[in-house]
Amino acid sequence: DKAYSVGAVLVTRDGQVFTGYSRETAPDNHAEEEAILKAEQAGATLEGATIYSSMEPCSTRRSKPRSCSALIIDRRMKRVVFAVREPDRFVRCRGEQSLRDAGIEVCVLESLAKQALEANAHILSGPIVNPAAESSTRPDAADRRA
């Protein structure tokens, strides 16, 4: 497996809970995207919602037209909580910054980072790609959280 393992929980303002994990219903789907899709299929209002994720929401993707950060911003969610910033192994993620720039509250729970990273040891144990030498235009770079 050459993609991050990520889980997400979305909680609407009225307390509805939706979960998702990477590659749950399609090979290119991210965890946040899965939770958003379930919420929308249920007719939930996502404005003002909070989404919790084990990893920073992506800021760029090759496999889809919208990043998870963009999906969150588009739906006017209020808050994003995640355990670990996406490691600079494949692409330099700017999800946290794009969310903050859009006025979304961001909370990083660094106390849970170790567990989130352990779930991805299959990727993090290999050689590290130099993020300065790699760009988000690399054909497979933005799909590693798929």
Kindly label every feature range from the protein language model.
Residues 1-2:
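Short, basic/aromatic recognition patches
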Residues 5-14:
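Short beta-strand scaffold segments in enzyme catalytic cores
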Residues 7, 58, 99:
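Residue-level signal for inorganic ion chemistry
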Residues 18-19:
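A structural microfeature
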Residues 22-40:
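Acidic helix/loop or adjacent segment enriched in Glu/Asp that either coordinates divalent metal
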Residues 25, 29, 51-73, 90:
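Local cysteine-cluster metal-coordination motifs and their immediate loop/turn environment
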Residues 44-49:
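Short helix-loop-beta connector
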Residues 63-146:
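Zinc-dependent deaminase
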